[in-house]
Amino acid sequence: MEPFKYICHYWGKSSKSLTKGNDIHLLIYHCLDVAAVADCWWDQSVVLQNTFCRNEMLSKQRVKAWLLFFIALHDIGKFDIRFQYKSAESWLKLNPATPSLNGPSTQMCRKFNHGAAGLYWFNQDSLSEQSLGDFFSFFDAAPHPYESWFPWVEAVTGHHGFILHSQDQDKSRWEMPASLASYAAQDKQAREEWISVLEALFLTPAGLSINDIPPDCSSLLAGFCSLADWLGSWTTTNTFLFNEDAPSDINALRTYFQDRQQDASRVLELSGLVSNKRCYEGVHALLDNGYQPRQLQVLVDALPVAPGLTVIEAPTGSGKTETALAYAWKLIDQQIADSVIFALPTQATANAMLTRMEASASHLFSSPNLILAHGNSRFNHLFQSIKSRAITEQGQEEAWVQCCQWLSQSNKKVFLGQIGVCTIDQVLISVLPVKHRFIRGLGIGRSVLIVDEVHAYDTYMNGLLEAVLKAQADVGGSVILLSATLPMKQKQKLLDTYGLHTDPVENNSAYPLINWRGVNGAQRFDLLAHPEQLPPRFSIQPEPICLADMLPDLTMLERMIAAANAGAQVCLICNLVDVAQVCYQRLKELNNTQVDIDLFHARFTLNDRREKENRVISNFGKNGKRNVGRILVATQVVEQSLDVDFDWLITQHCPADLLFQRLGRLHRHHRKYRPAGFEIPVATILLPDGEGYGRHEHIYSNVRVMWRTQQHIEELNGASLFFPDAYRQWLDSIYDDAEMDEPEWVGNGMDKFESAECEKRFKARKVLQWAEEYSLQDNDETILAVTRDGEMSLPLLPYVQTSSGKQLLDGQVYEDLSHEQQYEALALNRVNVPFTWKRSFSEVVDEDGLLWLEGKQNLDGWVWQGNSIVITYTGDEGMTRVIPANPK
């Protein structure tokens, strides 16, 4: 066969750092390196095969042929002199006969995007009047739907972060200047030659040609191609070595591609993307020694072995996590998924889940990569320990939970290991306008996505979550949603995202309950056939007390101190940080007996919050120190997934579903001994003494739900509240859309609430549309901005100006730190406060979204004096805002 005329004159990778060997890697070799990774990964994952072959009549062999063909075209935009002159030395080395021609300017090369240009050139070449023999001859035949190629080309050329669509592209931006016409002609011939070569390499052996119509393009292709490109660029001393020697013919290229399979297998192993799965052994394998499956756990083996959406409703502490994990294990064992992703509402709950998953990971995989992803995961000591273990003990028996360094380099890669634990916003990014969102989409698509505390999300976030569920359904993925209970309307909306059937959910009063919906139908599972596994019926004694602004009065505070003196573990849950701080201060003033009092909320630095969280778990956890009485004043941070246990709970009024979450921390664990007077679980609920809920409506704006919850509490009239009965009886009626007799102020409040909800739904739809048009940077500030409607916080950096520079709260001087240390110091010393505080400051936010606030250090801590407010910070109380009686 004749040597190649054009394609061997283009470089794909260039490096001056290699100490030996070539410093140029031919473009055609790089493209085949990437295709080799895709080929090897395909062979190792039945899940990926089934995903790409979903709803296709073509054989897997032919789908794979098209897949490799298009992936090898991912860098077609590099067949362009404007890219080649990014390393003019490399170009001239490969083209010694053309050094005298004037090349493109440095500025032109710097602005050149080979991904976007690749899509442009594919579009232009396809419309060209010049014929490319078999390849573009089909463009002359009007009936041929050549548009079927564009989704594939758009996906693979978008591998650097954002998928462009041909019809939306500014084509004038990529037109070749007339001064480069001679180069343009050669570039076009090279692209045509490369397409013909790829046809011979991949399509012809599968009985296909470029005149055939490819299958529908999977939404996972962009992520798959991007990952293959990352790994195919992983040049080491023994993988994907640079090579600038031109192949003699097509057979030499075929041999090169086959030889790269070993390199591909090696980098896949190094990356941590693949792992050996362990055979499913049942839910009992995940339980501690001596424990047997209970409640819904006994139903796992009966659940469908098929992709679907599963909604698990069960009481707090009933083993929902193990139920979900066992079902995920079962699906992985049957090659319906490759991995597991746990998404939780907060960083604290994600940290707690990481601890639980470390013990379970080795049951599912022989060498699992366990990854934690949220804005502060790099400061989680357990996660850092797991990462270090992978380095120091790789290959040894005790290294049974690994954390591949490559996977842990960024949050987006959490979705590529075997078990990922993250905050929910990391999942929502997969459908939002953020760079490389399709990497997250690929990871989710090949995983069982488990979303915990699904009741905790507002309308905006639920709108985004529904988009994630629909995307998962489109690729045949699986999702498990966990909640103590869900209102019927919300459950219906979630289930309707999956499959073609949208039959109404039967109003089944059974509890606990599993609803499953797949492509071909729906099933429901309960414990009616296993009455011995029904959760034990228990009661809580509500004690409603009406107080101004729902604030504990002197009598209540004194009762709390007396209870702690009697040995009780007492918790007061406040709806607002400011309220919690005031209550804490008043308790400290009244505490003459030195009862241990803690304050826990979200307005601490990361270091202080971590210390507070550990102290709370140590004192009030399952194995906490219960030798003396204590008091914890907290906000909502204790109501979600933290395993804490109190003898007496006092809580400000809140919606019923969240109230039940809080009550789940009361007598959470069976104990032989409770202090005298606290043998029966009593929950004191602070209600308003008049109409309306005041500032609490800023947090819980559904006034109707708040009012109906209050009515249910008051209607008990001293009777006990029985669980699990209340989950269904209360929530279904409280969240019922049907109107009932209610005061005028409730109706007025609902008008405002429904207007705000409508705006949130609109924002969710709008931001989902933006995902097709824009690409924002993948950083913490962007993630917060697009995933949490109206909840954007303001990161404050308190400091004291010294002669050496800015001294941060932990005592470090910012200017004395290295760049890496500065980055870490900013994360550890900032405090997130409500964004509304910004109007009190004249200081401006810097380019990283931080507001530096210069204050002074006194004996009590850091203090800043403004015109109308005083802000202080101590490790004990966190950041407080005080409005003086006589402001400046």
Curated annotation (Swiss-Prot):
Effect of deleting the gene: Loss of plasmid silencing.
Keyword Cell membrane: no
GO biological-process terms attached to the record: defense response to virus
Keyword Nucleotide-binding recorded: yes
Domain Helicase ATP-binding: 301-504
One family name in Pfam for this protein: DEAD
SUPFAM superfamilies hit by this protein: P-loop containing nucleoside triphosphate hydrolases
Cofactor: Mg(2+)
Record-linked SMART domains: DEXDc, HELICc
Sites where the protein binds ATP: A314, P315, T316, G317, S318, G319, K320, T321
GO molecular function: 3'-5'-DNA exonuclease activity; ATP binding; DNA/RNA helicase activity; DNA/RNA hybrid annealing activity; double-stranded DNA binding; magnesium ion binding; RNA binding; RNA helicase activity
Sequence motif: DEAH box, positions: 452-455
Class of enzymatic activity (EC top level): hydrolase
Entry's EC annotation: 3.1.-.-, 3.6.4.-
Key words of the record: Antiviral defense, ATP-binding, DNA-binding, Endonuclease, Exonuclease, Helicase, Hydrolase, Magnesium, Metal-binding, Nuclease, Nucleotide-binding
Domain called Helicase C-terminal: residue spans: 556-735
Effect recorded for H74G: 75% R-loop formation
UniProt effect for mutating D452N: Loss of CRISPR immunity to lambda DNA and of CRISPR-mediated plasmid curing
Function: CRISPR (clustered regularly interspaced short palindromic repeat), is an adaptive immune system that provides protection against mobile genetic elements (viruses, transposable elements and conjugative plasmids). CRISPR clusters contain sequences complementary to antecedent mobile elements and target invading nucleic acids. CRISPR clusters are transcribed and processed into CRISPR RNA (crRNA). Cas3 plus Cascade participate in CRISPR interference, the third stage of CRISPR immunity. Acts as an endonuclease, a 3'-5'exonuclease, and an ATP-dependent dsDNA helicase. Anneals and unwinds R-loops (in which crRNA binds the target DNA, displacing the noncomplementary strand). Unwinding requires ATP, annealing does not. Required along with the Cascade complex for resistance to bacteriophage lambda infection as well as the ability to cure CRISPR-encoding high-copy number plasmid.
Self-association and partners: Interacts with the CasA subunit of Cascade once Cascade has recognized target DNA.
Family: In the N-terminal section; belongs to the CRISPR-associated nuclease Cas3-HD family.
PANTHER family on file: CRISPR-ASSOCIATED ENDONUCLEASE_HELICASE CAS3, DEAD-BOX ATP-DEPENDENT RNA HELICASE 47, MITOCHONDRIAL
Stated name of the protein: CRISPR-associated endonuclease/helicase Cas3
Gene label: ygcB
